[in-house]
Amino acid sequence: MKRICIAAGGTGGHIYPALALAQSAMEQDPDTRILFIGNADRMEARIVPEAGFDFAALDTHGLEGSLLDKVKAAISLMRAIPKAGAILDEFRPDIVVGFGGYVSAPVLRAAHARHIPVMMHEQNSIAGKANKVTAGCADEIVTCYEKAGEQFPAGKVKLLGNPRGSVAASAAGDRQVLESLGLDPSKKIILVMMGSLGSTTMNDIMQQVLDRPVEGLQFLFVTGRGNEDAGRAFEGRPDVKVVPYVDTLAIYPFISGMICRAGATTIAELTARGIPAILVPSPYVAGNHQFYNASVLKDAGAAQLVEEKTLLENPEVLRDTIRGFFGSPMILESAAKNAARLGKPQAAADMLQDMRILCGGSR
């Protein structure tokens, strides 16, 4: 398995797990050739080359909007199939791995038509549209939740997890980062982070929730770049440190819990490390995926779920949840164990093993 083609695009939830798998493949065999296929005008066109991987672009659009928009999108997807085929013919991959996003659909269809082994990865508990329509092209479908597996042909599904969990599980942390932030490692640290870009709505809510100290807890409040003003209310507070961005891998080993969104990558990292969390799903994502992701952890006793609309009506609900959840050592320990039971820290290695088998190799 020397040549791998990875199709992923649109959002970080598709792209970062794909990059994690690619990096693991290179660690196992530095001579591996990897080609990413994505959209020319989406974030993958910047992120993938910056990570050091080759990138080829297609022009595809999602099936959203008006009827005319959907027709145009369908035409773009059909036109992308022969172009994807030409890219595959030139690169000659041993296997194609699709991580979702509409751009993956024409790539998987082109690979299937050429009898190239295909692995599909579904990050969420509710399958994405692109993966649903191309499931028939896949030889193996990797899921992160049992519920997701129920939406695909049973004989193709394997519950292996998200490669980002492998990255998080192996993170050693950086105590210097902790010290530079002025956090006390002898006290519980709660990371508050609403995705890489932050959330102005949740920033406003957190200012109300943390307007006074919570006994026994200190908070690292990540506002997102461009939202630094949200931290001014906490100037001089030793229990709340505010930054626009933090490398989560550097601080995961030192935190006792998180208050965060419920994107697929975040969930994979939390469970791989056994970090208990209060999850506030983003209500702005397609298919309400984050709510269903969060529900899985809540039902497993690994997290608390609080909806944003509830907090808009009464922010004190979150403060009460913080005190009851993070303030109880017994509840926190139980949630951490339950989160770890859901984790798949070997996801990347397990996927690579199965990829070799699909290519006709052995474990």
Q: Which residues are covered by each model-predicted region?
A:
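Active-site-proximal region of nucleotide-activated glycan assembly enzymes
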Residues: 43, 112-175
